Amino acid sequence: MFAHEEISNSTIDYLIEKVILAMRTHFHGKATLEFTADFHDNAEKMWVNKTSERLTCSKDFYNGVAQRCLDKAEPVSAMHGDLHFGNILYNPYNDSITLLDPRGSYGDHVGCGGDYLYDMCKLSHDLYHGYSELVTGNKYPDYVSWSFSKLVDKYYPTVYNEIIDGGALLIATCIKLHYDCPDRQQRMKDYVNDYAKNISR
């Protein structure tokens, strides 16, 4: 959406906030008792176990981020699981958004339950860290990352650092999945290593 159109800063703010509010209102509600009972084990699989299995670089930093995200994760009734703007359609004629390709699982749980932090970190890896640019070469306007940062601080001030750092973590843990393109893997590896070094200073 942002990569292919001339778009004003106010529209960028509006669209990102619209997605955040939609998730808070329609997805990230109170989880069922059944889902909550096994939440910690499933959250550990999503954050810590997956990180240890896939991580190939800056391991100390990103293992620490994974543990922080696990500590802050809270169960919700529904999450998307792959929430980036490539999976979001906006219809300007009726001001509606459509979410595509939800994950449908969380750890060993099959269904819509999850944690809100994972969804927000997925947005972070796209809007703040530029996942789409790393993969496709299509760069978002610079204002997108600033707008996202501002809105995270507005709606999620207590987990701001986890959302921003967690976005980089999700890039780091998907590098292995891009085995079909070594150049892309190297771009991603360079990015997450540079991010870890700059944050750790």
Please give the residue ranges for each predicted region.
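Aromatic-acidic/polar surface patches that form glycan- and anion
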Residues: S8, I12, V76-S77, G113-Y116, ...
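Active-site acidic catalytic loop and adjacent metal/ATP-binding pocket
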Residues: V65-G114
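Active-site activation/catalytic loop segments of kinase-like enzymes and analogous catalytic loops
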Residues: I97, S105-Y156, A168-R184
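Regulatory N- and C-terminal appendages and interdomain linkers associated
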Residues: D95, E162-R201
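Amphipathic alpha-helical segments in well-structured domains
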Residues: I12, I16, Y116-M120, K189
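Phosphate/pyrophosphate-binding loops and the adjoining catalytic core of nucleotide-dependent enzymes
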Residues: I20-E34, T136, V144-V152, E162-I164
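Short secondary-structure subsegments characteristic of cysteine-rich extracellular domains
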Residues: L15-I16, M23-R24, D153, V192-R201
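Conserved kinase catalytic-core helix
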Residues: F2-M79, A168-I171
